[in-house]
Amino acid sequence: MPMQSGQCWGDQRVKYLTEPIEGMDVLVTGAGRGLGRGIACFLGQVGAHLWITSEVEEELEKTAENIRGSGGWVKTRVIDLASESQLSMLTRDVKQGSSRLVAIINNAAVLERQSLQHIQRDSWEHTLQVNLTAPVFLTRDLVPLLSDEGGSIINISSRAGVLGFADQTAYCASKFGIEAFTRCLALELSGSKISVNSVTPGLKIKPTSITDADVVALQSTTSQAWSDPAILGPAFHLLACLRGGISGCRFDAITLANYIADCGSELTLEQLHAVAEYVLPGVDE
């Protein structure tokens, strides 16, 4: 059972591998808005070198300005992740330009609300390409950069990938796929210095698929209030520092961030397993 906020215990028998990310390269997709922007800006503040992507140049530059404004280092790539050729260009650029890639955060996602009766093939295929196919092949091509010294792969999931929701068939299928991909890759890389985990952001965090303009429009028709994704920064910082030992888990970002606030970031393997929503058997044994 996951631990609740405010519960701390200190069994120090088992440790896991971590490495500071200060001065190291981290790739965050979908960093032009929402959760992706919050993750990138927080990691920039703690000294990571950021590679960030978005399909919208104006939004991406806003994120980059925030990172540079706090003294951070960032490279931007405007990219349509549904394009195989553009995805290949991104992996080429990272391979050629990264001195030490330590974390891949597959965050970019699109969400089109359509019932099965009304779903169109092009919409279905685009959702799967951005939300699932791109993370799989981006990770495949960049894993060799992590292999020697280790690293962390963080796949952004959703409650839609755990529960399923009406009128979100393509999105839910893609997020269930992300959960399966995370578990399969964790098993394949078991025993290495590479951690593979998924994260559900929580309902209070504005989805990356919702633009800043959408937020303004929604505020006139709903009482929905989103929290600043920066509050999740400590959770993603901790996960980005992992180098094996914690893998095949699904974390709720808000729960993990609250636990870190209560207990600090020097957590044991048992504590992280206890706070995880799901732990894949056999990976860390």
Question: At which residue positions do the language-model features occur?
Answer:
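C-terminal helical subdomain
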Residues: 191, 198, 215-283
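Residue(s) in the substrate-gating loop at a strand-loop-helix junction
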Residues: 158
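Active-site loop immediately N-terminal to the catalytic Tyr-X3-Lys motif
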Residues: 117, 163-169, 191
